[in-house]
Amino acid sequence: MIIVLLGPPGAGKGTQGERLAARLDVPKIATGDVLRAAVKEGTPLGLEAKAAMDRGDLVPDAVIMGIMKEALAAPSAAKGAILDGVVRTTPQAAGLNDMLVALGRPLDAVLLFEVDEDELVRRLSGRTTCEACQRPFFGRQPGETCTEGGVSGTLVRRKDDEPEAIRKRMEVYREQTSPVIHWYEKSGANLVRVDAIGTLEEVEGRVLSALRIS
């Protein structure tokens, strides 16, 4: 199965994506992860991405889609993949669709995780992030130590996790994502809206039910 995840920051799509990927035995492919891997490996597309980042520019969609195509063509993705953070704009949605057609891989579903804005502010303003591994934590305080990923780092509260910054990010998210949702609706894609308020298990149950996975 090829599944695209959409949703605002703090909606839990990354966590649910990991759980879904484990259940389906497919990789969760996140744009940031594959970009960093391509840059580290020094692939031709990775070098193009690095050049753009070194200039302070956004990495071109064509480069991102090229890297995503390589990831989806890998043996590990033979059974499918969960795509997180891949689609943020309508050109990216169209580019991904064209790429999947070229690969002969159907898009099975687009999961849209929905959460009330006040709940997102509550969640994210209580989030800390490890300076070393960038893993987010909820319910832990700045200054605590993280030992995930084989490294030791300090937990910090990022400036963009302050309430005003969160509301600004939500405004940007709505402006970007509303056209994407409309594009998927017009394209006839299997767009599934998921109520993302509840425990991990409750939200996971809704995802599995929507996808008819037992």
From Swiss-Prot:
InterPro entries recorded: Adenyl_kin_sub (IPR006259), Adenylat/UMP-CMP_kin (IPR000850), P-loop_NTPase (IPR027417)
EC numbers: 2.7.4.3
Gene Ontology biological-process entries: AMP salvage
Residues annotated for ATP binding in this entry: 10-15, 127, 198
Stretches for region LID: 126-161
Catalytic activity: AMP + ATP = 2 ADP
One GO location term (cellular component): cytoplasm
Main location: cytoplasm
Location in the cell: Cytoplasm
Domain of life of the native organism: Bacteria
GO MF term (any one): ATP binding
Known pathway: Purine metabolism; AMP biosynthesis via salvage pathway; AMP from ADP: step 1/1
Family: Belongs to the adenylate kinase family.
Subunit details: Monomer.
NCBIfam families according to UniProt: adk, PRK00279.1-3, PRK14527.1
Domain note: Consists of three domains, a large central CORE domain and two small peripheral domains, NMPbind and LID, which undergo movements during catalysis. The LID domain closes over the site of phosphoryl transfer upon ATP binding. Assembling and dissambling the active center during each catalytic cycle provides an effective means to prevent ATP hydrolysis.
Protein name, entry field: Adenylate kinase
Record organism: Gemmatimonas aurantiaca (strain DSM 14586 / JCM 11422 / NBRC 100505 / T-27)
Lineage per the UniProt record: Bacteria, Pseudomonadati, Gemmatimonadota, Gemmatimonadia, Gemmatimonadales
